[in-house]
Amino acid sequence: ESAHRLARFAKRKVVTLWLPFVAANTVYTLLTNLFLKVNILTGDERILDLPGNLITTPVTIKDIIGRTAHWSVFDGGTQLGGAMWFIQALFQISLLYAGVEFLLKKLLRSGDTLIPQGLLAGVLLWLGWQAQRIGWNVWGLGIAASCYCLFYLGVVLHRVQHPHGPARGALCCAGAFVVLLVLGQFGSVGLAGNSYPGPLYLLAASLAGWMLVYEGAHLLARVPAVSGAFSALGRATMPIVILHFLAFKPVTWLGLLATGGESYLLAAFPIY
């Protein structure tokens, strides 16, 4: 029964996470030549003068097939699909967590898996930190190792945390915001590149960020109009993740029209 549930869980994650990742990156690859014609992407070498940008060359059918094979094992991604690192990490971590949970429940008579899962999360965080230090992130596994502990913390907090009343919730939000302001003086977290000052910093920033979002969401849920808007955003998470870099382009285009900027600057990433 438990093995059957694990298989169904894995199948669901393949359909809801892996397939959108591969499909979206493949579509972006298919549209590369069109994007080059309208300057959403560019082969103009002047774009390299802007930090974080790269030039793009036209693709062939062979390129599309080869790159799709790479996307299928999370080997790289497209520039416009850059935000999908989150989908990749969530797929890898959720499957690993579920697989470990299945094995632990088979091995442990008590059925309590939080402690061994926590130990594994600590080991993976250390490995993710070492991967960051040497610049290793093959197939996104460095990011997945670092983020496993955050998934674990989410499981723990889901069990023990309950929303506070308005007064305490507002106080928790304010406290979490202050903690994040203080932490911001010492560094930042960039999980898309597996970048953070250290394991303890990552944990502290993540806990504070979670508290701010969790308590803030419960406060906003008391306002019907706001609650409905956020519910709609939640249901549209996947399209937002896939399309939001592309959605920046109309904003950049309007800015270039207003300032008379050169057309190749439309390809500036993420925005000019």
Identify the role of each PLM range:
Residues 1-272:
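Alpha-helical transmembrane segments and their immediate juxtamembrane cytosolic regions
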